[in-house]
C-alpha cells in the first residue's frame, strides 16, 4: 500500500505554551480550517476536540497530550496539543521527544511566563526547531513587540517577526505578512473571508523597517543570501522563505507570527508557516540508538530502513490498552510480531489506529514519520523501543522528572482494595511521573506526583473511571537525604543459634557522589577477603537502605560507596548475612558523614495589582521564600521567588484572600536544597515518632 503523503510533505508538530496562552483554542481552529471538524469547539464551553477527558472539559485545561492528524495544502500535519500546567510537564516532555517542530504559543498580554520558559527548555533539550504564535492580540493590553523583546531577553532566542498586527485589542482587523509584503484583512467573524490588500499607508514606514530587519536577519543564515542582500538591498519572497526555513532547521532563527485564535484571525497563516518553515521527518537528523553489541547506530527516516519506533504514551482505553508510537524508520503492519528491545520481549501488533482526539481510524500499516497508536501490546511502557526482531536497536529514551509530592490512599472497603490496585497499575502505566509504593511501617499505599493538581486529577480519575471509593490523606513533601562529608563505615553481622550460624562483615568508604548520580557502588576488594558471590548481596543491602533512608526515612541521593575490606566464615557466611552487613555498614557510614535533609524548592511567580506588592513579599518571606526579582508594569506587580514546597500548601487560598481575588501565581519544581537545621530536626523527630 502506497503512502498517502510523501515524507517531505509530512509535519509532526506540537503546540505548547504556558497555561491559558490559548494552545487548545489554536488547535481547535487549525482543525476547523483544515476540515477535520465542521463546528468550532470552545475550551470554556467544554467542547474542545482535543480536550476529551471529563476532567479536561470541566477544568478548561489540557492534561494529556492529544494526538490528531489533519491535512493542509496537500500536506499531512500530525499535531500534539500539550498541557501548559507544570504538574503535567511529563506530557510536554514526551511530546517534545517525538516531534519534529513546535509552535510555541505566547499570550500577547502575559508574554513570557514561567511555564513558557520550561517548555522552551524542554524543546532545547530535544533540539526541536520552533516558531512562535503570539495569540490573544484582541485582548486589552496586547503588545506584539513587547513579547518579541521578552523572547529575545528571557529566552535568549533569535526571534524575528515575519508578521505584524493591523491594530490591536478591540481594533485588531488583520495581519501584515512581512515576507510577501501584503496585508490580510478579515471580513467576517468566522475568519473565512480574507481580503489580500496592499500594506495600509499609515503602517508603511513601520512595515518597511521590520521587513528590512527580517531581510538582514535571514541574510545572516546563508553566505549566498548575504551577498545578494549587500548587492541589491533586497531579497525575493522565495529567498526569504528559503532563508527562514534554513534558519529554523539550524536553530538559528525563530519566526514570530501573531493573531487571535479565539477571534479566528491568523490561524490559516500559521498553517501556511508550518508547511513553509517547520521540518519534515527527512529534514531532522536521523534518530540515534544503541545496538546489542553496545555500538551506536542511526535509523534514517525511510520506509525501506529496518522498522524502529518509540512508545511515547500509554493510555487505558475502553477497547484495551492504547500505546502511542512515533515511527522513525521502516513499516509497522497490523498482525505482525515485533521486539520490545528495551525489555527484550516479543509483542504482537493486533490493531493500528491514527487518532482525531477521541475519534479513531483503523489502518493496516504505519510508516516512517507517522504518529499513531497500537492496540494489543502487553508489556510496552512509555519510553520503550519497538523494532524488528532481525535488526534490534534501542533508541534514546525520555527524560522523566522525579515526583515532589505524595499522599496516602486508603480504600474504604475490602471491595475497593482490589479496584484500587488495578487503578494504580493502569494509571502508573500511563504516567511515568506517577509513582506508587507501600509504606513498610504503616502498610499504607502512597502515591506520588508532580504537584497538588496532578494528584487531584489522578484521584478524580480513580473515582470516575475505576469507581474506587478511597480516603485521601493530606499531601506530603518528598524530602531526600544526602551526605556532606566522607567517612568509613563497618557492618558485622554475626549470629550463633546452635547449628549453622550467620556471618557477614564488610568495611566501606563513603563520600558524596556527583549531583544526580543517585547511589554509586565501587568494589575494591582484593585477595578474596570477601568472596565474589557475596559482593552483590552486600551492594544490594546498601542500595535498599539507601532507598529507604537513614536519618528520616527518605531516599538518600548522590552517595558513593566503595567496598574496601571485610571477612567471611567458610560455613556460616551466606548471601543474607552479607546483605544485612552491607546495610549495617551503610547506616554506620551515613551517620559519620554529616547527613542532611533536602527539600524540593519551587520557582514561584506571582502577579497581582501593585497595591498588594508589600503584603505578597512579606508573606513569601514568612514561608522561607527568597524573592529573586520584582517588577511593576501598568499597575501590575510581578514577583519571582524560590520557596520550599512544604510552605506552599494552601497558598492559592491565601493569595486570593490577600489580594481580594485579584492575584494569580504559578509554581514549578526548581531544585533540591538543604533544609535549615531547626526545620530538619522537627521533621526527623516527627518521623522517628518523638513528636
From Swiss-Prot:
GO terms for cellular component: cytoplasm. Keywords: Cytoplasm, Elongation factor, GTP-binding, Nucleotide-binding, Protein biosynthesis. Residues 8-282 form the tr-type G domain. One of its GO terms (biological process) is ribosome disassembly. GO terms for molecular function: GTP binding; GTPase activity; translation elongation factor activity. GTP binds at residues 17-24, 81-85, 135-138. This is Elongation factor G. Its main location: cytoplasm. It is found in: Cytoplasm. PROSITE patterns: G_TR_1, G_TR_2. PANTHER family: RIBOSOME-RELEASING FACTOR 2, MITOCHONDRIAL, TRANSLATION ELONGATION FACTOR G-RELATED. HAMAP family: EF_G_EF_2_B (MF_00054_B). SUPFAM superfamilies: EF-G C-terminal domain-like, P-loop containing nucleoside triphosphate hydrolases, Ribosomal protein S5 domain 2-like, Translation proteins. It comes from Synechococcus sp. (strain CC9605). Belongs to the TRAFAC class translation factor GTPase superfamily. Classic translation factor GTPase family. EF-G/EF-2 subfamily. NCBIfam families: EF-G (TIGR00484), PRK12740.1-3 (NF009379), PRK12740.1-5 (NF009381), small_GTP (TIGR00231). The keyword Nucleotide-binding applies. Catalyzes the GTP-dependent ribosomal translocation step during translation elongation. During this step, the ribosome changes from the pre-translocational (PRE) to the post-translocational (POST) state as the newly formed A-site-bound peptidyl-tRNA and P-site-bound deacylated tRNA move to the P and E sites, respectively. Catalyzes the coordinated movement of the two tRNA molecules, the mRNA and conformational changes in the ribosome.
